Amino acid sequence: MIDTKHLDVAVQDLRNVLRDGLIATDIWDRTDGLSLAGFNAQPVAVALFTRITTELESSMADSNFPPLARYYLIDLAGNHTAAVLNHGSLLQGMLVDNKRANLGILISVAIPRMIDAIAKAR
């Protein structure tokens, strides 16, 4: 069982770390697409990244690549980055403004803290 209060605290911590560089984040169940916590929720992005992640996992397996591990990043136009974190049965998406948030902080602080926080919410 997931403790959604822990998820809410984790989202607030993420907002504190990335400040105004965090445009949006959602944490959702990858089976039904139900968002469990978030900031500036993006239901269309939840559906999109669930599909992309499923296709990516399938294609990597078919190509005999190692499976996805903790996360993947997508460099977007307008100096933005999308990060998708793999928490097993949960996925998390983040949209980050690279002009306002340092990518080093995203990769070395924000992502590891989210991974730890979601693990503790289980």
Protein language model annotation of sequence segments:
Residues 1-122:
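Non-catalytic interaction/Regulatory regions outside core domains
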